[in-house]
C-alpha cells in the first residue's frame, strides 16, 4: 500500500471551518471505497484565527508543515473583525503564496451543470458553453512591489514590476494547460500595454515565449479593460486559457466567478511547478471569501469540494478519483440538492453528504 497523502488543512476564518470539513468528508469517502488511497490530514491556523491565537496571520508551524505536505487545502481568510490594521488576515495568504513560491493561480470558469444556466446573471444563450481557465501570476507584480504608506504627508504609492523570467514561467504554465487538450486551446493574454511599461514587457515576453517554445500554439493579446467588457457581453469569446498579471488576474477572475451563478461553485489551485506528472505542489481553495454574515450550515461547499478534486488531479496523482468528485457534484446539482445561493434549501452538510455518497457509488 502506498504511503498516505499528507494534506495540511488551513480552515481559516468563519465559513472556512465548514467548507474544509465537507471537502475532507468527500476525500474520506474515497478512502472508504479505495483501500489503496489514504490521506493524512493535519490542521493549522491561518488568517484571523491565527491572529487571535498567536498574534500573527501565519504561524511558523503552519508554514513549515505546509512545506512538508503533499498539498495544502485552505478554507477562507478575513472578516470585518480584523479590519484594515497593520496586522491583517490577508497577509497570511500573501505570505504563504510567496514562501511556497505558488506562482501560478488556476481558476476555472465553467458550469458544473447546465441545470445552473438560469442562475447566471448573463442570459443563458450567451452564458452556455463558457469554459475557460484564468492563469494568474501570483507572486509578482503590484501586490509584491515597493510601496509607500501615507505617513502624514498625504502621499501613498505602489509599484508594479515584472521580470522576463517571471513572465516566461507563467506563460509556460498557460501553454502547458492549453496543450492538455486536442486540439490545443487558444491562449488569451490580458494586459494594459497601451499605458503600462510592465505590460509592454509582459506582452513582448509572452509573445516571444510562445513563438520560440510552443510554435503550435496561438496567443492573442487583449487589453484588460476590453476583456472585462467581453466577459460580460460574450464570455465564450474568451474560452480557452487566459493568462494575466497578479492584480489583473485577481479582478478578472472575480468578475468571471459570477458567470456560473454563484461564488460558491468555483475552485482554484495555486501551483509551485508544472503539473506535468500530476504531482505539482499546490494550495487549493475556493474562489469565495469567508462570508462572516452567513448563518451556520448555509454556505455552499461545492467550490471547496471541487478544489479538492483539482488537488487530486494536479498534486496527488489521483486523476480518476478527482474526476469522480466532479461527476458526483454534477449528479448532486442535477438532483436539485443545493444550498440557498443556488435556489435550494439544503444545508452545507447535506450537500457534502450527498456528494460523498455519489463518490462512493462512482468508485465502488
UniProtKB/Swiss-Prot annotation:
GO cellular component, one term: cytosol
A Gene Ontology biological process term: L-leucine biosynthetic process
Chain positions recorded as substrate binding sites: 97, 107, 136, 225
Cofactor(s) needed by this chain: Mg(2+); Mn(2+)
Pathway: Amino-acid biosynthesis; L-leucine biosynthesis; L-leucine from 3-methyl-2-oxobutanoate: step 3/4
InterPro entries recorded: IsoCit/isopropylmalate_DH_CS (IPR019818), IsoPropMal-DH-like_dom (IPR024084), Isopropylmalate_DH (IPR004429)
Catalytic activity of the protein: (2R,3S)-3-isopropylmalate + NAD(+) = 4-methyl-2-oxopentanoate + CO2 + NADH
This enzyme's EC code(s): 1.1.1.85
Binding annotation for Mg(2+): 225, 250, 254
Note on how the cofactor is bound: Binds 1 Mg(2+) or Mn(2+) ion per subunit.
Binding site for NAD(+): 79-90, 289-300
Residues forming coiled coils: none
Record-marked site positions (Important for catalysis): 143, 192
SMART domains associated with the record: Iso_dh
Annotated localization: Cytoplasm
Keyword Oxidoreductase: yes
GO molecular function list: 3-isopropylmalate dehydrogenase activity; magnesium ion binding; NAD binding
Claim: Cytoplasm is one of the keywords in the record: yes
Its biological purpose: Catalyzes the oxidation of 3-carboxy-2-hydroxy-4-methylpentanoate (3-isopropylmalate) to 3-carboxy-4-methyl-2-oxopentanoate. The product decarboxylates to 4-methyl-2 oxopentanoate.
Subunit structure: Homodimer.
Family: Belongs to the isocitrate and isopropylmalate dehydrogenases family.
NCBIfam families, alphabetized: leuB (TIGR00169)
Protein name per its UniProtKB record: 3-isopropylmalate dehydrogenase
Species of origin: Saccharomyces cerevisiae (strain ATCC 204508 / S288c)
Amino acid at each position: 500500500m502506498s504511503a498516505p497523502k499528507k494534506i495540511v488543512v488551513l480552515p481559516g476564518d468563519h465559513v472556512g471551518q465548514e467548507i474544509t470539513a465537507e471537502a475532507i468528508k468527500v476525500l474520506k469517502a474515497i478512502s472508504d471505497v479505495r483501500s489503496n488511497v489514504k490521506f493524512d490530514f493535519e490542521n493549522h491556523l491561518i488568517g484571523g484565527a491565527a491572529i487571535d491565537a498567536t498574534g500573527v496571520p501565519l504561524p511558523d508551524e503552519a508554514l513549515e508543515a505546509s512545506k512538508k505536505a503533499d498539498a495544502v487545502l485552505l478554507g477562507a481568510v478575513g472578516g470585518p473583525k480584523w479590519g484594515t490594521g497593520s496586522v491583517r488576515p490577508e497577509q497570511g495568504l500573501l505570505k504563504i503564496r510567496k514562501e511556497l513560491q505558488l506562482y501560478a493561480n488556476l481558476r476555472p470558469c465553467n458550469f458544473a451543470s447546465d441545470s445552473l444556466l438560469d442562475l447566471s446573471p448573463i442570459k443563458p444563450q450567451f452564458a452556455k458553453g463558457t469554459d475557460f481557465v484564468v492563469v494568474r501570476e501570483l507572486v509578482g507584480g503590484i501586490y509584491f512591489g515597493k510601496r509607500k504608506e501615507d505617513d502624514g504627508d498625504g502621499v501613498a504609492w505602489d509599484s508594479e514590476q515584472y521580470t522576463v523570467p517571471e513572465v516566461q514561467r507563467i506563460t509556460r504554465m498557460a501553454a502547458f494547460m492549453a496543450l492538455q487538450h486536442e486540439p490545443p486551446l487558444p491562449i488569451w493574454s490580458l494586459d494594459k500595454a497601451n499605458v503600462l511599461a510592465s505590460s509592454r514587457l509582459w506582452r513582448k515576453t509572452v509573445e516571444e515565449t510562445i513563438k520560440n517554445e510552443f510554435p503550435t500554439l496561438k496567443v492573442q493579446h487583449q487589453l484588460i479593460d476590453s476583456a472585462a467588457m467581453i466577459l460580460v457581453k460574450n464570455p465564450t469569446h474568451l474560452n480557452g486559457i487566459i493568462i494575466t498579471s497578479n492584480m489583473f488576474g485577481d479582478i478578472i477572475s472575480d468578475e468571471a466567478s459570477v458567470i456560473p451563478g454563484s461564488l460558491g461553485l468555483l475552485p482554484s489551485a495555486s501551483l509551485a511547478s508544472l503539473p506535468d506528472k500530476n504531482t505539482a505542489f499546490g494550495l487549493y481553495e475556493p474562489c469565495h471569501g469567508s462570508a462572516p454574515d452567513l448563518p451556520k450550515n448555509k454556505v455552499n461547499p461545492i467550490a471547496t469540494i471541487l478544489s479538492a478534486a483539482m488537488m487530486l488531479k494536479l498534486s496527488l496523482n489521483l486523476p480518476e478519483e478527482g474526476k469522480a468528485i466532479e461527476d458526483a457534484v454534477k449528479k448532486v446539482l442535477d438532483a436539485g440538492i443545493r444550498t440557498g445561493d443556488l435556489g435550494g434549501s439544503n444545508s452545507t452538510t447535506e450537500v457534502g453528504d450527498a456528494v460523498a455518497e455519489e463518490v462512493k457509488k462512482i468508485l465502488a
